[in-house]
C-alpha cells in the first residue's frame, strides 16, 4: 500500500482479501455496483439535507461520476454473465455510521469523514 494510504487508514488491507476476492468475483462485482450507487445517493442526500452548506457545486459532479461508475460496473457484470441483484450490505460502513454523531454540526463532519475513509479503503485495494 502506498505510504499516503497507510497514513490515512492506519492499517493495511489484508493480503488474504485479494485471494477471497478472486474466489468471489460475482459477489465482488455486485457489491462494487452497490457501493457506487450508494456513493451517488449519499452525495445527493447530502445536497438535499444541507442546502445551506453549498455542497451542490462539489457533490453534484461527484454523484454523476459515481453513477457513471455504477453503469460501468453493471456492464462488466452483464459481460461476465452475472445478474445484478440486491445483496446484504457489508458491516464496514454500517459500523462506521453507528459510531458517528447524530447531532449537528458533527453529523455532517462525521458523514464526510466516513465517506472519505470508505473511498480511501477502496482505493487502497487497487494497490494490494
Predicted stretch roles:
Residues 1-23, 37-42, 93-96:
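Short alpha-helical hairpin
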Residues 14-30, 91-116:
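Acidic/His metal-coordination segments adjacent to aromatic residues that form catalytic metal sites
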Residues 57-90:
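Conserved alpha-helical segments that form or flank metal/cofactor-binding pockets of metalloenzymes
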Residues 43-47, 74-77, 81, 99-101:
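Membrane-helix exit/interface motif
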Residues 21-64:
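Long, hydrophobic/aromatic N-terminal blocks
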Residues 126-128:
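Conserved small/polar residues in nucleotide/adenosyl-binding loops
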Amino acid at each position: 500500500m502506498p505510504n499516503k494510504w497507510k497514513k490515512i487508514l492506519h492499517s493495511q488491507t489484508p493480503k488474504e482479501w485479494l485471494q477471497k476476492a478472486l474466489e468471489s468475483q460475482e459477489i465482488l462485482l455486485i457489491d462494487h455496483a452497490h457501493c457506487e450507487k450508494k456513493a451517488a445517493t449519499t452525495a445527493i442526500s447530502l445536497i438535499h439535507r444541507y442546502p445551506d452548506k453549498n455542497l451542490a457545486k462539489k457533490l453534484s459532479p461527484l454523484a454523476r461520476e459515481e453513477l457513471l461508475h455504477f453503469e460501468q460496473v453493471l456492464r462488466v457484470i452483464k459481460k461476465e454473465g452475472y445478474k445484478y441483484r440486491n445483496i446484504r450490505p457489508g458491516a464496514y460502513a454500517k459500523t462506521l455510521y453507528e459510531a458517528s454523531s447524530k447531532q449537528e454540526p458533527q453529523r455532517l463532519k462525521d458523514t464526510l469523514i466516513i465517506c472519505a475513509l470508505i473511498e480511501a479503503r477502496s482505493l487502497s485495494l487497487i494497490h494490494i
